[in-house]
C-alpha cells in the first residue's frame, strides 16, 4: 500500500504572517528571489518510500515518477534496466523529437499553397489571418504542444515492450492511493499502470485531508520555512532529507489505516 501526492514548496508563503515573542520580533532571513519547487511523494506502508522534484505537473512527468517508483520497488535487475531505458530513450529528447516532426512537415511549396488558399478563400480578413496562423503553428517544429504530444506517444511506445510487462507481472503488485487530479486519470497513465503492475485507488473527490501524506508535507514545510537556503537545489535537498527522515514514522498513517479498516 502506497499513498501518493504532489505538493509545491517555496521560500515565500502564500499568506503573510508576523511572529512575535514577548517584547521582540522574530526575523527570518530569506533571500530576495522567489524560489519554488514541485515535489511528488510516495508514502509507502509495506515497500520503499520515494520522493522527487518535478519541473512540471502533467501526465508525462507523472508517468516518469511512476516508472522511477516501480524501478525502486522491483527486484529483477533486467526489469529495472528495461524501464530505465524506456524513460531515458533518445526518442524522448526535444532535439530528436523536432527532427522527427520535421520529417512530416509540408514542403515549402506546399506550405505556400496552403497559405494562399486560405488567403483568398475566406471573405473575412480576420478569418484568413487566424487560418494562416493555425497553419504556421501546425507546420512549426518548435510547437510546444506538438513536442509534448509526441513525447507522450513515444514514451508509451517505449513502455509497450512485451518483456517489460512480463517482468513487472512477476513483481509485487503496488496499490497506489491518490486523488482524482486530471493527470492521474489520463489515458496514457491508465495504459502505463497496467504495464507497470500498479493498481490506482482513488480517494473521494475534494477530500485531500483523507490522505495521510498531507501531514508529512506540513511537517516538512515547517522545517523549510525556518531554514535558510540560497537556491532551488538546496531547497530540494532540504525537502528530500526531511522527507526520508520522517516518512517511515507509522504515526502518520496508523489512524488512517484504522479508519479504513486496513490491516497489514
What are these regions (language model features)?
Residues 5-7, 41-43, 66, 115, ...:
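Generic structural signal for small/hydrophobic residues in well-ordered secondary structure
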Residues 213-264:
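C-terminal anion-handling pockets and recognition modules
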Residues 97, 109-123:
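DNA-recognition alpha helix
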Residues 125-140:
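Major-groove recognition helix of helix-turn-helix-like DNA-binding domains
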Residues 178-180, 201-223:
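RNase H-like two-metal-ion nuclease catalytic core shared by retroviral integrases
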Residues 1-72, 76-80, 84, 89:
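Extended, low-complexity cationic-aromatic segments
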Residues 5, 81-88, 95, 168-184, ...:
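Acidic/histidine-rich, metal-coordinating catalytic segments
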Amino acid at each position: 500500500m502506497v499513498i501518493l501526492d504532489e505538493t509545491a514548496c517555496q521560500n515565500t508563503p502564500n499568506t503573510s504572517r508576523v511572529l512575535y515573542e514577548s517584547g521582540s520580533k522574530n526575523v527570518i532571513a530569506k533571500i530576495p528571489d522567489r524560489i519554488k519547487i514541485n515535489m511528488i511523494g510516495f508514502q509507502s506502508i509495506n515497500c520503499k518510500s520515494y520522493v522527487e522534484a518535478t519541473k512540471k505537473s502533467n501526465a508525462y512527468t507523472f508517468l516518469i515518477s511512476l516508472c522511477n517508483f516501480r524501478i525502486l520497488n522491483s527486484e529483477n535487475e533486467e526489469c529495472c534496466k528495461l524501464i530505465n531505458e524506456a524513460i531515458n530513450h533518445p526518442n524522448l529528447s526535444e532535439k530528436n523529437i523536432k527532427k522527427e516532426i520535421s520529417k512530416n512537415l509540408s514542403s515549402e511549396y506546399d506550405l505556400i499553397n496552403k497559405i494562399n488558399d486560405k488567403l483568398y478563400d475566406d471573405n473575412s480578413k480576420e478569418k484568413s489571418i487566424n487560418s494562416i496562423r493555425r497553419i504556421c503553428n501546425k507546420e512549426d517544429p518548435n510547437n510546444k504542444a506538438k513536442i509534448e504530444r509526441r513525447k507522450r506517444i513515444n514514451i508509451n511506445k517505449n513502455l509497450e515492450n512485451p518483456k517489460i510487462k512480463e517482468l513487472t507481472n512477476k513483481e509485487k503488485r503496488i496499490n497506489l492511493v491518490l486523488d482524482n487530479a486530471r493527470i492521474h486519470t489520463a489515458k496514457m497513465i491508465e495504459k502505463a499502470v497496467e504495464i507497470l503492475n500498479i493498481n490506482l485507488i482513488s480517494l473521494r473527490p475534494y477530500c485531500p485531508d483523507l490522505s495521510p501524506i498531507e501531514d508529512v508535507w506540513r511537517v516538512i514545510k515547517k522545517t523549510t520555512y525556518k531554514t535558510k537556503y540560497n537556491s532551488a537545489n538546496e531547497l530540494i535537498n532540504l525537502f528530500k532529507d526531511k522527507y526520508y527522515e520522517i516518512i517511515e514514522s507509522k504515526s502518520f498513517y496508523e489512524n488512517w489505516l484504522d479508519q479504513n479498516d486496513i490491516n497489514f
